Amino acid sequence: MQDSSAREAPGDRATHKLFENVTCPFCGMLCDDLEVENRDGALKVLKNGCGRSIAGFERKLPPSRPQIRGKDVTLAEAVKEAAALIGKANNPLFGGLATDVEGMRAALSLAERAGGVVDHALSEGQYRNVKVLQSAGWTTSTLTETRNRADLLIVVGSDIRKLHPRFFDRVVSPPDSMFDVTALKRTVVFIGEVPERAAVNGPQVGDTVALPCKVEQIGEVLGALRARLRGFRVNAKTAGGIAIAKINALVELCRQAKYGVVVWAPPTLDLPHAELTVDQATGLVKDLNQTQRFAGLSLGGNEGAVTAAAVSTWQSGFPLRISYASGAPHFDPYRYSINRMLIAGEGDLLVWIASISPDFAPPATDVAMVVLGTPGLKLPQPAAVFMPVGTPGVDHAGRLIRCDSVVSLPLKNLHRAELPRVADVLASIEAAL
């Protein structure tokens, strides 16, 4: 089927195509407004790119062929060897999981057939959310609702621009919004180590407030804010290094807000028991909803992490970190952490899937590896079997689920390279078992 959004440049019909409304697979926001040119197989981002998307789309692929222990083979031979290794394994581990919806479905099917464990490489950050959602629940917004309606944003943590370079441009300070419901000026508050005030500008941004503190102090600051909102006296002069007077000022901002959003990115909250910080953020939202409209917004989800968790949930009934050793899915967020299992020597084969970024390497391990990776993937040691695969949204069409978990977006085939889909390779391995 021809892509209606792709058009050939006049006078250069054979070698030059322009793709409009391209969805970028290189971060969890899945920005879908890019324009990308394909000239003789080389891609160039022409509009609405960021550093992450430009690096991803414009990366030159090195020559890559299927290999068995470093020796070039055909894809059929690599599939046969991978199937033999998986069939012999007592406890195969299916990790990485940087793929699209179809690839994740195929990974779960193969893991079920092989009696393996399934866990995404970035699930440690995700479980900072899952533990709170499972135990207490929450009220969340979406990227679109935040963009269109928020008049107060409280950004918890830092490095959001590193995860999502266009978050502030597209969501916090967009040039326009729907329905003309956005406040004329929105206030942005930063609580964390590196306030990103310089990233927030534009006609819709009014005041920006920075409450700098260490990441391990964010929970204390949020706790003091919740106490003051509920009318409790705080005897200390500071909380988390922030003067109580500044926290009182934030209380007034919260009370004046018509649609407030608390934003956090679990991958940036890298500290022991970070779920307690997430719990304070979502608890703040619950407190404020007693009298007004407030919501949370969790970011992250790069490398297909949100997609993997969503597919796992609707296929098995459980989030990631499940085992099919018994023939049915068994969920244990501690026991089935692949990183922990590799350190403890509990797996005898690692099947690693990394189809998006070349830096998404497996951990160093003595366990034999079957790798489905984008060409140029940086491996800590040679794989028993390596099979180059295409990147969804670049080398083939597909679907990914956005970081706010409310929509799956279609990915176009930009025809960079003729590489197989993860889903097809995994299906071939399963058929060969």
Language model: regions and residue ranges:
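N-terminal, charge-rich interaction modules
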Residues: 16-33, 270, 299-317
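N-terminal export/assembly segments and adjacent metallocofactor-ligating motifs
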Residues: 1-227, 266-267, 431
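Short connector loops at secondary-structure junctions
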Residues: 116-136, 293-320
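Non-catalytic alpha/beta scaffold blocks inside enzyme catalytic domains
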Residues: 130-289, 324-433
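Generic macromolecular interface patches on structured domains
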Residues: 92, 235, 291-294
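Short helix-loop-beta junction
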Residues: 110-117, 283-291
